Amino acid sequence: MKSTYIIGEIGQNHNGSVDIAKLIVDLVSRPVREEVFNLELRPMDAVKMTKRDLSEELTDSQMNRPYDSPHSFGRTYGEHRAYLELTDEEHFDVYKHAKSLGLDFVETLCSKGCMSLLKLFTPDRLKVASRDLTNLPLLEVMAETKIGRASCRERV
């Protein structure tokens, strides 16, 4: 029987820090000991990160909106969101770390502008964000990469 393929979602939990992202990768790569039922769960198979291009995602008014939450990383919503983003090079750094631990690397690319990341490395799989399931221009660009399991001919 095949085992379930488990992906550890990093998302924005790295708070804009490569070191935190790598720590999460370290944790995902370890088995989990569950003491109540005396189980040892195997490590996850992959980690997933998300790459966004805020200039394609947010309007000027959204970017410049004051953002004074106690948990804000900037004076405006744009500054806050920009702080949380890792660069292409930082994604590559996390990718290399994950691969060194034997993990697959999955990437959600949220816009065509994010395809620049693919100049540095090729993730094992691409994931489509649920909000982009009908974003045909993005889906076509992602399918053309031939990363993962589907091709342009297989699209619906």
For each predicted feature, which ranges?
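Active-site-adjacent beta->alpha loops and helix N-cap segments on the catalytic face
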Residues: S17-D19, D88-H91, C114-S116, V128-K146
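Conserved, mostly hydrophobic/aromatic
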Residues: E9, V28, L118
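Residue-level detector of conserved catalytic or cofactor/ligand-binding positions
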Residues: K146-V156
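A structural motif corresponding to the C-terminal end of an alpha-helix
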Residues: V36-L41, E89-F105
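Generic N-terminal amphipathic, Lys/Arg-enriched alpha-helix
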Residues: M1-N13
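Glycine-rich, proline-tolerant flexible connector loops at the mouths of alpha/beta enzymes
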Residues: Q12, G16, E35-E85, C114, ...
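Hydrophobic faces of well-ordered beta-strands that scaffold small-molecule active sites
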Residues: I6-G8, D45-M49, F105-T108, D124-V128, ...
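Glycine-rich anion/phosphate-binding loops
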Residues: N15-P31, D88-E89
